[in-house]
């Protein structure tokens, strides 16, 4: 069973992802957060296999959180999902250790497909 943690400031998006992922075999959403600080605390305790991470979060950016996750637990797969797919965000995310980078508006289904693998 692949354990997933969702980090996005949009409650609607977290709910949508949770509902979609609950239909995917061998995938379990073990937690979710709307900000980076709560997410980091939860991730340290819950130890997910994969984190779905938005870039724009209250308090700290998703890219900063990504760096902290990878420094602490480099084997966690981190999928960046954003509405702001600017080239500089993509480059910063990959440099910080992102495993995938998706536009959550245009490539939402691709996120789900990656998790099915």
Predicted regions and their residues:
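Acidic catalytic/metal-coordinating carboxylates
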Residues: 35, 61-64
């Amino acid at each position: 069973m692949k354990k997933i943690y969702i980090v996005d400031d949009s409650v609607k998006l977290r709910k949508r992802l949770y509902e979609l992922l609950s239909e995917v075999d061998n995938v379990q959403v073990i937690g979710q957060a709307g900000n980076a600080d709560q997410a980091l605390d939860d991730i340290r305790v819950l130890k997910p296999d994969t984190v779905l991470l938005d870039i724009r979060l209250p308090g700290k950016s998703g890219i900063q959180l990504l760096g902290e996750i990878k420094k602490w637990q480099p084997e966690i797969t981190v999928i960046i999902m954003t509405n702001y797919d600017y080239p500089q965000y993509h480059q910063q995310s990959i440099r910080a250790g992102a495993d995938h980078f998706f536009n959550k508006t245009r490539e939402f289904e691709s996120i789900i497909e990656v998790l099915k693998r």
